[in-house]
Amino acid sequence: MSEKIAILSAYSFVNIEEPESLIPKLLFVGKRKYVKGTILLSKEGFNGSFSGSYESVNLVLEELKKLTNTKDVNVKINCSEIHPFQKLKVRLKKEIVAMNVDNLNVNLFKGEYIETKDWDEFITKQDVIVDTRNDYEVEVGTFKAAINPYTETFKQFPAWVEQNAELLKGKKIAMFCTGGIRCEKSTSLLKSMGHEEVYHLKGGILQYLEDTQNKNNLWQGECFVFDDRRAVADDLAPAEGYWLERK
C-alpha cells in the first residue's frame, strides 16, 4: 500500500525584513524533497499550503520556522491519496492574505479564539455570525445562520464592514473562515475599528470538521478549498463532484 500524501497548511504573522531572500532557500529544500504547493512570503509573515510525504512537509515547515525565527505558527495537517498541487511555488507578496488595509497590526489587535469543541454552543448564543469567505465559497457550504457578505475577493470585506456598521455595532460577533488566517485579519480589522466583542473559530472550518465531525450538523454542505480537491466533506475527504480534472 502506497504512503498517503500529507497536506500541511501553515501561517504566521511575523516580521520578515527581507522575505525575498527566503525564496531560493525554500525552493531548494522543497524541490529536493518533492514537495508541491504554494508558499506566500511578505514582510508581515508567511502563509503556505503544500503536500508531500509527512517527513518532507514537516522538514519544509521547520525550514520556514528557522528562516523566520519563529515558533508561533498555526499548523494544520491532513491526508490525501494524491498530491492536490501540481508544483512548488514560493511567491513574494505585499500581504500573505490580501485585505488591502494599510497599517493593520494583526499582532496588536486580535479577536478572541473559540476552540472547536466550544464552537457549536458558542454560535447558538451570539448576536452576529459572519462567514468571512467569498460568495463562491459560501455557496459550497457554511454554518447555519451565518451572514454571507457576498464578496468576490477578501479585499471587499472591509467595505462590507463599513456598510454594515449598524448591524455590527455593540454586538457579540463570531467569525470563521477556512483555515483561520482570514479571521486573523478580519477580527483584527473590527477590533481596530472599536468593536469590542469579536471572536473567531480557532483553526477554521477544516480544524472544526476534523475535531467534531460536524456531530450537531450546524455545518451545512462541503468546505471549499484552494487546491485540486476544490471541496472536502465532513470527514475531510474530497467531496464528490468537485475534484478538478487535470489536463
From Swiss-Prot:
It catalyses: uridine(34) in tRNA + AH2 + O2 = 5-hydroxyuridine(34) in tRNA + A + H2O. Belongs to the TrhO family. It comes from the Bacteria. Its EC number is 1.14.-.-. The active site is at C177 (cysteine persulfide intermediate). This is tRNA uridine(34) hydroxylase. Keywords: Oxidoreductase, tRNA processing.
